[in-house]
């Protein structure tokens, strides 16, 4: 049996194994996907050494906090990873480790599903880590020309200017000044508000008087409706959580590992529905 992993920290509540194993079962692939918590970069190094030696390991996903650290252990990177400088998917092929990023694809497709147009919009991204980089790259691929970025450590937001200098304009915003500008779209890429700290929010809409956004997105999927999204919804703003992004990026990763094609139109909704039944998270219905 082939092996796949999700590596990172604090994976206790991750539903990625359920989603990936659901995909593997759908296509009768003899493989299993498991979580593996790594406490530090030394454990990351040991894991990579194990992957290279174990012929049954096909690849793995990476989540917080190793999406950037993993690059030094990979032999080749895709074009989007070269730009983003963060990877969430690695495939082992002919003894080499190849790094990809499917996060931006999942993010982009989930926005497209909602009919969100980012062209000529004022967009604020909260956070500046690997998830933020994938988000910004996805926005660029959808036609965005500039993005405001607010991070608690201003210098980290400032560094994104260099990362994306060749493709779009990054406008760093000091964390305490994030309420001073009018935005059409606000996107949270931080872990603030994630289970179990569900009362926390990275943005206080009661303090935001510069204008009302038309769309608010939270990459968090547990809970499905974070405090951030609840506050936005009370203001009449359209909202979206990160569950569709999670499923879309998982499907893209499986396509990289196993060349899966011909997904049924309802397959995404079937997985979302299965997630609802098994975890009490979902709010989606299968169509047709």
UniProtKB/Swiss-Prot annotation:
BP-aspect Gene Ontology terms: amino acid biosynthetic process; aromatic amino acid family biosynthetic process; chorismate biosynthetic process; shikimate metabolic process
Domain of life where this protein originates: Bacteria
Positions that bind NADP(+): 79, 127-131, 151-156, 219, 242
InterPro entries in UniProt: Aminoacid_DH-like_N_sf (IPR046346), NAD(P)-bd_dom_sf (IPR036291), Shikimate_DH (IPR011342), Shikimate_DH-bd_N (IPR013708), Shikimate_DH_fam (IPR022893), Shikm_DH/Glu-tRNA_Rdtase (IPR006151)
Active site: 67 (proton acceptor)
Record keywords, A-Z: Amino-acid biosynthesis, Aromatic amino acid biosynthesis, NADP, Oxidoreductase
Cellular component, GO, one term: cytosol
Catalyses which reaction(s): shikimate + NADP(+) = 3-dehydroshikimate + NADPH + H(+)
E.C. no: 1.1.1.25
Record: residues binding shikimate: 14-16, 63, 88, 103, 221
Pathway assigned to this chain's UniProt record: Metabolic intermediate biosynthesis; chorismate biosynthesis; chorismate from D-erythrose 4-phosphate and phosphoenolpyruvate: step 4/7
UniProt-listed CDD domains: NAD_bind_Shikimate_DH
Gene Ontology MF, one: NADP binding
Family of the protein in this entry: Belongs to the shikimate dehydrogenase family.
Assembly notes: Homodimer.
Database matches in NCBIfam families: aroE (TIGR00507)
Protein's job: Involved in the biosynthesis of the chorismate, which leads to the biosynthesis of aromatic amino acids. Catalyzes the reversible NADPH linked reduction of 3-dehydroshikimate (DHSA) to yield shikimate (SA).
Protein name: Shikimate dehydrogenase (NADP(+))
Organism: Caldicellulosiruptor bescii (strain ATCC BAA-1888 / DSM 6725 / KCTC 15123 / Z-1320)
Classification of source organism: Bacteria, Bacillati, Bacillota, Bacillota incertae sedis, Caldicellulosiruptorales
